[in-house]
Amino acid sequence: GEDGYIADGDNCTYICTFNNYCHALCTDKKGDSGACDWWVPYGVVCWCEDLPTPVPIRGSGKCR
């Protein structure tokens, strides 16, 4: 799997308000774990560890 900032179908990150929200989001997508992380310029967003390949991770390009 891959570590990274989990993204929705529009290449946008998920805003993180609580670590348990991100952890649940990541494990629901079959990742190992998740937590809040500060990422300039996006702010506090969800970081996931060991996501399976088909789950989108924030890539280069704009959030649509």
From Swiss-Prot:
Cell compartment(s), UniProt: Secreted
Boundaries of every LCN-type CS-alpha/beta domain copy: 2-64
Domain of life, source organism: Eukaryota
Matching Pfam families: Toxin_3
Annotated disulfide bonds: 12-63, 16-36, 22-46, 26-48
Recorded GO MF terms: sodium channel inhibitor activity; toxin activity
Tissue specificity field: Expressed by the venom gland.
Gene3D superfamilies documented for this protein: Knottin, scorpion toxin-like (3.30.30.10)
Keyword flag Lipid biosynthesis: no
UniProt KW Disulfide bond keyword: yes
The entry's keywords: Disulfide bond, Ion channel impairing toxin, Neurotoxin, Secreted, Toxin, Voltage-gated sodium channel impairing toxin
Principal location listed in the UniProt entry: secreted
Cross-referenced InterPro entries: LCN-type_CS_alpha_beta_dom, Scorpion_toxin-like, Scorpion_toxin-like_sf, Scorpion_toxinL, Scorpion_toxinL/defensin
Domain notes: Has the structural arrangement of an alpha-helix connected to antiparallel beta-sheets by disulfide bonds (CS-alpha/beta).
Family that this chain belongs to: Belongs to the long (4 C-C) scorpion toxin superfamily. Sodium channel inhibitor family. Alpha subfamily.
Summary of the function given for this chain in its UniProt record: Inhibits sodium channels (Nav).
Protein's name according to its UniProt entry: Neurotoxin BTN
Species of provenance: Hottentotta tamulus
